């Protein structure tokens, strides 16, 4: 029986319709550690600008960044960090983010990245789950972690000031008395180097274990080869505006820029005037954006085509972009190629990328999110039967390759539910591949709400809501929003006799979560629709929204 089952499985694998990049596979040096890979061409670029701090104007050459990462590694080791440990980076974009990440990598440690504007509860939960040994943060988050860290004996390093109970970044990491790390620790390509948190297709945030091999492969899939899919040149100036605590920016901006030898201009936060100023001053040529930034540029009368004339490439990820928006935006950036990518944290994160970005570009279609990256396989499966589908048939997108995650930290069950026995990562996204190998996303199986590219897990908000004494049951689903893409809205069942209002519920949630997880609207219902197994029927609730629901505080839905 066992041999028959194996034969049947092998036959099914042979019948699988697999899609690959139009670009040929390349040799990827996945035996290298991430830092060795990024600095492999250091002798050629040592004197070139590497990181430019948009706020202070400080410029760090490639040679300086490499040395400072060694110094940061020595500083982290002095704070007790060793191979297999975890460093929490609780920072907005800044040079210290790069020094810390690369320094931890040299020690064989992993970095778990988090948004400094998270609430204390959100930060503490991630730091505890990840097992952080050191927290590197900035002024806006010091108060959120100081007590938590002191209780657990975790050193806190502050990059931008002197605070009681913290050590300064310069003193801890960059002091001249600290000898830079001479030799990196013995690191295996399958050791974890990045530990971002993602909700995957469902549930609460989970630690995504990305290894040195994962990230080397993912970056190489983008920028390596004679005809790279993402053609970064050494003379390029890449804008690093999207938050580095998000894996897309860490991978496709910082690490890809380092590998290519480009200059990287770091912005701490989005400000349209500052963006224009930095673009003019430094001659920015590559600008990775998300659609909300594209919307603001497209609609702002303050931005002219002259302001952004140096930009030759605009990478848009995290959410789909319609043709009307593209046209309005391109009028402001007439010299640029605009294209989209498609990613998922668990996939390393890039699954697909626009081939108009290649050194030898291809014609691409509007609305496509690109073609699967090279050295990887993609298939479309029927979400109900698991059967493989062909071209122009919509189903769940699955990806396989060395770039995908090792698994979820301490969560084998969720790992098993996401990566099947054949090594295919199931994205929870519904899409199809057309006759030209271009991928189109049409729907989402997974529950995650995408607010301006940020993940909002419904389960997290639901768990919070039902802790309120006036709330009997709750469900959270996305509602379409022109600016944000999606916003979270809640369906609430009040306990008998309660008169709790929409505003009271919104305020209750706002105190506990980061700004982008706050509820946009609250609707009251007699009950939450659920399957026999108790699973919330989110499609039913989304259908109610699509049908149009009155939005006053007294809305009562009959289920």
UniProtKB/Swiss-Prot annotation:
Region (SBD2): 341-408
Signal peptide (residue range): none
Residues annotated as binding (E)-4-coumaroyl-AMP: 248, 252, 318, 340-341, 345, 353, 446, 450
Listed EC numbers: 6.2.1.12, 6.2.1.34
Annotated positions binding CoA: 269, 452-453
Residue span of region SBD1: 271-340
Subcellular location: Cytoplasm
Summary of the function given for this chain in its UniProt record: Involved in the phenylpropanoid metabolism by mediating the activation of a number of hydroxycinnamates for the biosynthesis of monolignols and other phenolic secondary metabolites. Catalyzes the formation of CoA esters of cinnamate, 4-coumarate, caffeate and ferulate. Is more efficient with substrates in the following order: 4-coumarate > ferulate > caffeate > cinnamate. Cannot convert sinapate to its corresponding CoA ester. Required for the biosynthesis of lignin in roots and shoots.
Protein name (database record): 4-coumarate--CoA ligase 4
The organism of origin for this protein: Oryza sativa subsp. japonica
């Amino acid at each position: 029986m066992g041999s028959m089952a194996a034969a049947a499985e092998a036959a099914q694998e042979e019948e699988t319709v697999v899609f690959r990049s139009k670009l040929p596979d390349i040799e990827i040096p996945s035996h290298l550690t991430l830092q060795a890979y990024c600095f492999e061409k250091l002798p050629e670029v040592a004197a070139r600008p590497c990181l430019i701090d948009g706020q202070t104007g400080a410029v760090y050459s490639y040679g300086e960044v490499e040395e400072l990462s060694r110094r940061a590694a020595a500083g982290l080791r002095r704070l007790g960090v060793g191979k297999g440990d975890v460093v929490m980076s609780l920072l907005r974009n800044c040079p210290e983010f790069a020094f810390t990440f690369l320094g931890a990598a040299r020690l064989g440690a992993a970095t778990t990245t988090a948004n400094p504007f998270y609430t204390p509860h959100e930060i503490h939960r991630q730091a505890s789950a990840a097992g952080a040994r050191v927290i590197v943060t900035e002024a806006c988050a010091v108060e959120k972690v100081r007590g938590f860290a002191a209780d657990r004996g975790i050193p806190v390093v502050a990059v931008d000031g002197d605070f009681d109970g913290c050590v300064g970044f310069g003193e801890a990491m960059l002091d001249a008395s600290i000898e830079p790390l001479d030799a990196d620790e013995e690191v295996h390509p399958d050791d974890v180097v990045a530990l971002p948190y993602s909700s995957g297709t469902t549930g609460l945030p989970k630690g995504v274990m990305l290894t040195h091999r994962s990230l080397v492969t993912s970056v190489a899939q983008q920028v390596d080869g004679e005809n790279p899919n993402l053609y970064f040149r050494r003379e390029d100036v890449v804008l690093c505006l999207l938050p580095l605590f998000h894996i897309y920016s860490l991978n496709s901006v910082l690490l890809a820029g380092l590998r290519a030898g480009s200059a990287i201009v770091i912005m701490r936060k989005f400000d349209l005037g500052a963006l224009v100023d930095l673009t003019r001053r430094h001659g920015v040529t590559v600008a990775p954006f998300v659609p909300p930034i594209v919307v603001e540029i497209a609609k702002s009368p303050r931005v002219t085509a002259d302001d952004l004339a140096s930009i030759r490439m605009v990478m848009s990820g995290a959410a789909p972009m319609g043709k009307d928006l593209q046209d309005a935006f391109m009028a402001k950036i007439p010299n640029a190629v605009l294209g989209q990518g498609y990613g998922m944290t668990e996939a390393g994160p890039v699954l697909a990328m626009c081939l108009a970005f290649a050194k030898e570009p291809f014609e691409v279609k509007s609305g496509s999110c690109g073609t699967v990256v090279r050295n990887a396989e993609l298939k479309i499966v029927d979400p109900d039967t698991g059967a493989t589908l062909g071209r122009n048939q919509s189903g769940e997108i699955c990806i396989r390759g060395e770039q995908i995650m090792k698994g979820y930290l301490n969560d084998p069950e969720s790992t098993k539910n996401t990566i099947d026995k054949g090594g295919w990562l199931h994205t929870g996204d519904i899409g199809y591949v057309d006759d030209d190998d271009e991928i189109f996303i049409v729907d989402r199986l997974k529950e995650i709400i995408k607010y301006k590219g940020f993940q909002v897990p419904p389960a997290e908000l639901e768990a919070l809501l039902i802790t309120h004494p006036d709330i009997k049951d709750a469900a959270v689903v996305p509602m379409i929003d022109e600016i944000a893409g999606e916003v979270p809205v809640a369906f609430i069942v009040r306990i008998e006799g309660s008169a709790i209002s929409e505003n009271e519920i919104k305020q209750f949630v706002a105190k506990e979560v980061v700004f982008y997880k706050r509820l946009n609207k609250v609707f009251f219902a007699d009950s939450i629709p659920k399957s026999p197994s108790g699973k919330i029927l989110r499609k039913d609730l989304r259908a109610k929204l699509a049908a149009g629901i009155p939005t006053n505080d007294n809305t009562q839905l009959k289920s």
